[in-house]
Structure formats: structure tokens, C-alpha cells
């Protein structure tokens, strides 16, 4: 290479260096770019250890929490006792078995009418030997029970009131349950009927309820899971929420878990879908009978069908209270028992679980015994004679007028979202920005593709946005089916329903709206709201019962018999078998949903659902719309 060529090469290299320096200067100074909305980053694909994932399933009565690798979760009463801030403060306690609507003038008459229907149903169903049951009147048992007096046991009660001598600010779980009523503590149950227990009384504000939840969950994580709170930054959380959820409450819970408690990431998923994961079923009509509410939902391939979601405002606690009423009619020998007494409520719960059943073959009067063990009281042994009361109480789930609840909304659906100022691209935004041309073209296409009954034109044109889950959004409140809701019952996540199905569903809804719907009828309604006959057949052949509210002997056979008798005749011919599953894989039905959350933690697809703490700080509730496995 000549000298001239070398100089030419050097000159080119120097020019390249000068260009690079200019580019660096531009980067340092900054270049004007068009303003664009921030793009939510794609979730990071990383290997996650399951033992660093905490699965959290909060219930009205019980909290279940544990690592995803745990065989069983920690199970704790979901209650907190808070010390009074002032010495003269009036004591307050949230009711457990007591609820509004019980002491109305019509309550007793309604209970009696419900009991007549229960007795008629008991008599109409023959026993396995083909003979009808002989009814047993409460008077027969009462004449014996009135003469019973308790016998003292040699051993004194080992139960003690929780020691509050060191004046703890709050007590959680079992300790809160056994706080002496004379101590200066308020007792709160932060979740009621599956929703945050927000009310107008003491400790009923949203801030107070969230503070109670944070205190309970933090305590259990430290004491039961043995995880220091400062180490939560290394842990992730899976939160199970009700199928009919309140968007605002879910947002506040995620905020609390990520920002207050300090989890590094979170996944939010629905209880019904997790129940199918936990039971190993791909599709099922999930019936979750809890302590204070019963929720129903049809799940297909990990998707909860919105139209099939239903929440009934009764559960196991109502059965316990009904059993107590029946015991009193039969002359219950423990005459000091009170529903307002926490310790008596625990006893009644135990008696229900021990004595009640759904076995038609058990008939006639039978003698039983039970013990009372109360703090600072001697242990006593009682004899009691019972007849049909043991069967009548759980049958109230199928005839809920027996609960005697008057003036309360007993059935609720999920309806449209009220919008969130932090989520500008919500349903209201989509509806508002959709052009009239798009709406009219969509409506005309639907009119051409679907046969319409007279007078239905134009109704679907009011629909906008994604049709997959615009069926109604949001707060877990009761639905008033007026004209504004006429278009909010569109199809589930799988396909749109034809107008005839919409009309039939609206007609059906108006028939039972506001009434207490029996469990069997609610199951039939939930399945009937599925869009296709094929899906309905799947659901009839896989009815999954979870939760602790239906843990009675022969409950599976009893429910199966009622579904078979009441299902539409057209399906009776095509459905091969109606299968009710109460103990999938021989597991405790109360743990199925939690177990499903643990399974969810191990799935590869879960990688796409994690909401990280930094993302939540930056984008807020929009992350739920982007990452939630269900349509937010």
C-alpha cells in the first residue's frame, strides 16, 4: 500500500470517529421525539422458584395461606381483635351468625313456610328400601329434652381466655376468637359474604378494613410461614379473588400487597378457575359453598363464563343458625346458648358438623351427647334427642326461605364497571371513542347473521368494545335489571349469544331477581346461561362442589338426585350422566381452590401474568387489564 493510500484510509477512519462523537453528543443533548403513551413492557421470562411464591386465599371466616410447595396451607380464623384507644370506649363486635333481616315481623312466618316445604320434600322422597319416611315432630323430642340436666365432668375445661395482660395492640386468629368479652377489644371480621366488610360502624371504613387484612396476613406470614416481613421483597404472591369481584377492592388489595407489604410481584386469579386447577378438571360448573356466601360459575378450559356467574348471599353460617332455631324448637338442653356469644357460635358450628346430614335413610328419634368446654367454666356433658332437625337444617340450602331472611338481596350478578380514573382505556373509553360508523356496521352485520324476534332491532347496536366479556362488569353488588342493563348480559368469553338466548335469560332473571334461589335451582340456572348446548352438556357431567358449607354425609347423592329431577327434559335425553364431584382426588373440598393457586404457580403460562412492583407503581390498575387471566 502506497503512502497516499495509507493517508486516505486514516482520513476515512478519522471521519468515522468524528461521526460517532457527533452521535454521542446528540444522545447527551437529547433529540426531540414525538410524544407517545408509555408502552407497558412485556413480562420478563425468568425461572421462578415455587417455594418463593405465597398463595393467599382469603375467605369470610377462614384464611388459607401457604407456600406453593406446601402440602397443606396454614388455616386461620379470618378475624382480628383491636385494643380500644380510649378506656371509656364502647365495645364493638362484628356479627358472625347474626345478620341483618332476621328480626323482621315476617321472619318467623317465612321460616315456618320454608320448613313446611322442607318437610314436604323429605316425605316425598322414598328411602332406599322404597318406604316413605315417617315424619318426626319436634314435640316428640322436646318432651324428652326439657327434662335433661347437664352432668359435670371430672376434668375441668382446659379452655382459657386469651391473655391480654401485656396489652397487645391487636390479636389475630384463634387468639382473637377467645378474647374475653370483658376486655377492651373490638372484634372485626374484615371479609363478609366474600367482599370487603365495609360498613358504617366502628372499623367499617375501607382504610380500616385494609389495615385489618394487612395486620392478619402479616402476622400469619411471620408466625405460621416463618417468613420475616423484610424478606417479602424476595417473594411473590398469588391472590385468589371471588368470581364476582369488586374492581376497586381488588385494586386496593394489590396495592397493599405490593406497596405496603412489599411482595415483589403478584398474580390475581378467580377462585372458580383455581378450583378446576386444583381438582384436575378442564371444565366444570364450580359450586363454592362457603361460610357466608355461595358462588356458582361455569369454567371451560381455564375461562370463567361471565353470564354463568351467580352469588347467593347464604352459606354454612346460615345453616348453623337455622340448626340452632330447630334445636330450640326441639327443647335444646343448653338453654343459655346465644347467637351473639362467640364461644357459643363455635359450639353450634361443631354440633352442625357432627350431627347434620343429607341421608334420607336415617330416620326417627336418636339420642346424642355433646360437651361444653368454655373458659373459666366447668366442662359439662349434655344428652339431647333429635329427629328430623339434623336433615332439615342442611336442606335449607335448597329452600332458603327457611333461613328467615327478610328485606335483603339474596342473589347478585356481576355488572358493568363504574370506571376508574387511573384506567383511561377502560370499557367506558372504548364505548365513547368507538365511531358511530363502526357501531352501525357491527349492528347491521349482527342483524344479517342472527335471526331476530320482532321488536329486537337496535338493541345489540348499543354494545361496544370487546364482546367477549362485556356481559357486565364490576362491583360485587346486586344487579337491578332495568333498561340500562338490558344489553349487559351478552355472551361469555367463548362466543356471543343469539338474541333469543338474551331474551330468555332476561326473562329468567326477572323471575328470581331479589328472591332467595335454592342451590339446585341456582346450579341449573348457571348452566342454562352457557351459550351452547355442548357446553351445557359438559357442565352437567362435571358439577364440582368446593368449600366447607356442604360437607354433610350423602350430600353428593342428594344433590345429584335433585339436579337429575329438575334438569330440563331435553337434556335428560342427551346427557349421559350427571356427575357431582365433592371430593376430587380424595382432597378436602375446602382446600381445592388454594391447591389450584399452588398449581397455577407452577404453570409456564403464569410467567405472562406476573405484575411486578415497579410496573404497578408506574402503570397502576392498567396492569390488571394487561396481565389478569380474566377480562378486567
Curated annotation (Swiss-Prot):
Plays an important role in the functional organization of mitotic chromosomes. Exhibits low basal ATPase activity, and unable to polymerize. GO terms for cellular component: chromosome; nucleus. This is Actin-related protein 8. Residues 1-30 have a biased composition (Basic and acidic residues). Component of the chromatin remodeling INO80 complex; specifically part of a complex module associated with the DBINO domain of INO80. Exists as monomers and dimers, but the dimer is most probably the biologically relevant form required for stable interactions with histones that exploits the twofold symmetry of the nucleosome core. ATP binds at residues 288-291. Residues 1-43, 410-429, 434-494 are annotated as: Disordered. PANTHER family: ACTIN. It comes from the Eukaryota. The keyword ATP-binding applies. CDD domains: ASKHA_NBD_Arp8-like (cd10206). It is found in: Nucleus; Chromosome. Residues 434-443 have a biased composition (Low complexity). Coiled coil: none annotated. The gene is actr8. GO terms for biological process: cell division; DNA recombination; DNA repair. SUPFAM superfamilies: Actin-like ATPase domain (SSF53067). Keywords: ATP-binding, Cell cycle, Cell division, Chromosome, DNA damage, DNA recombination, DNA repair, Mitosis, Nucleotide-binding, Nucleus, Transcription, Transcription regulation. It comes from Salmo salar. InterPro entries: Actin (IPR004000), ATPase_NBD (IPR043129). GO terms for molecular function: ATP binding.
